[in-house]
Amino acid sequence: MTDASFAPSASAEFVRGLPKAELHMHIEGSLEPELMFELAQRNGITLPFASVEEIRAAYDFSNLQDFLDIYYQGAGVLITEADFKDLALAYFQRLAADGGAHAEIFFDPQTHTDRGIAFDTVMNGLLAGMDEAEKTLGVTSKLILCFLRHLSEEAAFETLEQAKPWLAKLAGVGLDSSEVGHPPAKFARVLQASRDLGLKVVAHAGEEGPPAYVWEAIDLVKVDRIDHGNRALEDEALTARLVKDGITLTVCPLSNLKLCGVPSLDVHPLKRMLDLGLKATVNSDDPAYFGGYLLENYLATADAVGLTRDDIVTLAKNSFAGSFLTDAEKAQRIAAVEAYAAAH
């Protein structure tokens, strides 16, 4: 295996076949316009769009608030267990086509329970999709419940209470939604309560929020992973700490570009993260809205920042090493990455 960059055509074939995991993907953010339209018709919901093309045009936003508006509007078509199953299965089919072997998907129960959908409906539907994906596609998955940080700590505790009958089916909890003004400290108690129940803890930090939020996430909340983490690079001591502790960063390049976290992909910090020894991974975040699933994120970023073959293999290995699989499963998956790289 050489450390030379390679032609985009060769890299696409190589990266598609490379075993890899996705650790940062919001299932509600994988709702494609076609499925939104189909579910609206199925459930008798009137959308402010006359066609799939009009929905797709609405997906062309340029800021976080416009994205959140269409995101929550889209979630409103998810009503039944079958809807959530279809949503999950559609994502896993795309992941499998991209060479994804494992995913740890986020879901936002408050987005659904606040509009009268039962927590159990969401869980039953998503789990059915996950089970079918494993049986028919060979893709394994885990589920991470996210608390919406623009809502209250009290609301998060209510959601955790609703989740208690489902603990065996949940790998962890996370924090998502509007970051600025809602530091990890706001949810420190509910995240500790979640950890006490045996759940892993992750948090979005350092996407729009300052490095101080990343410090809070690792020192106060004691997260198992940082979701995004780009702005950690502004603080040398924080970067050194993340390297020393080997904390995985679930980086989302095309999301950063779409939401103007970077002005262009060629200045994205992913390559610098790897060069500094950070445990960075590549992920799609909200792929239906941000212009690309897992493979597109790998290929677009590799081309823009000059990732080498070894960089790409490292990213794939990091994705399994940073997962919530067992140590034995991680070792098996990483060995599969190494075997593939050696054979190709």
UniProtKB/Swiss-Prot annotation:
The record marks 228 as: Important for catalytic activity. The keyword Zinc applies. It comes from the Bacteria. One of its GO terms (biological process) is nucleotide metabolic process. Its cofactor is Zn(2+). Its EC number is 3.5.4.2. GO terms for cellular component: cytosol. Keywords: Hydrolase, Metal-binding, Nucleotide metabolism, Zinc. InterPro entries: A_deaminase_dom, ADE, Ado/ade_deaminase, Metal_Hydrolase. Zn(2+) binds at residues 24, 26, 204, 285. GO terms for molecular function: adenine deaminase activity; zinc ion binding. Binds 1 zinc ion per subunit. The active site is at 207 (proton donor). It catalyses: adenine + H2O + H(+) = hypoxanthine + NH4(+). Substrate binds at residue 286. Belongs to the metallo-dependent hydrolases superfamily. Adenosine and AMP deaminases family. Adenine deaminase type 2 subfamily. PANTHER family: ADENINE DEAMINASE. Catalyzes the hydrolytic deamination of adenine to hypoxanthine. Plays an important role in the purine salvage pathway and in nitrogen catabolism. HAMAP family: Adenine_deaminase. This is Adenine deaminase. It comes from Caulobacter vibrioides (strain NA1000 / CB15N).
